[in-house]
Amino acid sequence: YEITTRLVGSEMCIRDSLEDESKIAFPWSMIDKITPRPHKIVEEQLVKDNIEDMEPIVTSKNTFIAAFVNAERPQYLVVEDKFPNGRPPLEKAGVYMTDRDTVNKTERMKVTTCLNPLHTAMSVYGCMLGYTLICDEMKDADIVALIKRLGYVEGLPVVVNPGILEPKAFIDEVVEQRLPNPFMPDAPQRIATDTSQKVGIRFGETIKSY
């Protein structure tokens, strides 16, 4: 009985602490940085530049571990400014510190309008048309026309504007810089995976808005 009482009391104490926002918090966050798994093209370029030991290790579960990362320059980390015990000056590292509602709106802007719907649409058609790189798809005028219509014509009129990022400028960067980037090789096959599970959130919100 004594042990049970202690266990129950301890659990209730932990629960009460978790519910006390003056002591502990669980800030919302949104991150946007396209980072595919290490690509052979990048590895070959690094080796060509006389950088050694660039060959990735592939685990038994087909996880790639490499000394380099395929990553793009644009990056957005939006965090709810809710730290009851203080925090470092994350703004100095480019982090957007804001309220929970703005974090949520930024996520909705990206996922339902300005990036993910474009990415998914072009990837599905890219797979059907035999493309293996997103940047190569961006040389196809029909695919570019498709994502521009999705973003600018259908998306922008109903976009959720978070206030800290301007939706049109965000799409401009996606279409003009991020997707055409040949130095960040990404496969439409990766993006198109599980598309059936993504349709609702990536296209449904825009449809509902109309």
Which sequence ranges carry the predicted segments?
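C-terminal catalytic subdomain
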Residues: 125-210
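Domain-level detector for long, ordered catalytic/regulatory cores in large eukaryotic signaling
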Residues: 17-22, 27-28
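A conserved active-site cap/scaffold subdomain adjacent to cofactor or substrate pockets
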Residues: 39-163
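General secondary-structure edge motif
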Residues: 8, 54, 101, 187-190
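Catalytic cofactor-binding cores of redox enzymes
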Residues: 6, 25-26, 118
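Glycine-rich beta-alpha junction loops
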Residues: 28-34
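Single conserved hydrophobic/aromatic residue that forms the stacking wall/gate
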Residues: 1-9, 13-16
